[in-house]
Design a protein with these regions (language model features):
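Long, positively charged leader/targeting segments at protein N-termini
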Residues: 1-19, 24-28, 66-186
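Short peripheral tails and domain-boundary helices/loops at the edges of structured domains
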Residues: 31-63
Length: 186
């Protein structure tokens, strides 16, 4: 942590592009590792139940679950181990919590909860995640919340491709950004 301002444009951290988790690259990897086509079947079902705007996030959700299962063998283990485990957003709320929300916040929270429920519903088709993990609600909430709070849309902001930048996701969680993020398209 610094106690003095640094000049604009100063590099604070460099994260190689190949370490970043982009939904387009992750989708290719997961589909290639899916022996019975379960990942593609889950995405197809997600599209059919109205989750077509969530497909990119779903791929990152699956990637985090796969890396979670790899434990210490995951190249992302240190980063995953340093992530928060407790979240206070819609996927983690109880029904009573929803009743206490003002109408607009309630409707926005329900959208997030429906997205999580859709992910859980189609997860049964995925063949690269163990049944133990598929039935572990706490792990599923953790992976969903990690994606939901850390993924950002492509430069056009259309969300067709979303990315999580390991370690780089630790910046800009306050009201005012601490750093300006720059991509060199490595």
């Amino acid at each position: 942590m610094t106690t003095q301002d640094i000049p604009s444009g100063t590099t604070v951290m460099y994260i190689p592009a190949e370490v970043c988790l982009s939904s387009s690259a992750v989708s290719q990897e997961l589909n290639a590792n899916s022996p019975t086509g379960g990942v593609a079947a889950a995405v197809d079902k997600l599209n059919k139940i109205g989750g077509q705007n969530s497909v990119a996030d779903f791929y990152l959700f699956l990637k985090l679950l796969a890396e979670y299962e790899a434990e210490e063998n995951s190249a992302y283990f240190g980063w995953l181990d340093g992530m928060p485990r407790l979240f206070y957003n819609a996927a983690s709320m109880t029904d009573f919590c929803y009743e206490c929300l003002p109408p607009l916040v309630f409707s926005l929270s329900r959208l997030e909860k429906v997205k999580f429920d859709n992910f859980k519903q189609v997860l049964s088709k995925v063949d690269i995640i163990s049944d133990y993990t598929k039935n572990n609600d706490e792990v599923l909430k953790w992976a969903f919340n990690a994606v939901y709070t850390r993924a950002y849309a492509d430069k056009d902001g259309q969300g067709s491709d979303v990315t999580i930048t390991p370690l780089g996701d630790m910046f800009n969680h306050g009201t005012f950004p601490q750093v300006e993020v720059y991509f060199d398209e490595g």
